[in-house]
């Protein structure tokens, strides 16, 4: 395994990166691709194609702010999964950033499906459940982190979108698509199996 991270803008096959992104996340979870590209031109964003031996196998999108890395998107090409690539990427990110937070679609413990499989993957790779959930753009998310002692607050989560760009226009566009200013954190135990 020879994993490399190549800036999206100098990647040879941008179309493949875009296809991995679109095939890995449902419509409600996805930012418009043009918006990701626009924000990625700023210094606090890492938008990388993930390569193994010069073959594109995945994509990562990280927003950096206040000594935190928000792993907004991580996807391995569906034809390349279960080869240890995702674990290697998370290991590399954890070496680079002391505190990583991410949100995944909330998995219900009694339902074996892709959501639970994804959560188990992150837990196996050094992430912890914060037992905090939020609702954003019609999707219920659970917040995970690799730093068990990090305090997840509304302000921390609000910044994950605000720090994507310095452009007031782009911030406005983001606020119209995703829940930037109206974050309601819920403890998982309070929710039970209910969606809020």
Question: Where are each of the predicted segments found?
Answer:
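Conserved catalytic-core motifs of GNAT/GCN5-like acyltransferases
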Residues: 119, 123-142
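Conserved GNAT acetyl-CoA-binding A-motif
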Residues: 96-113
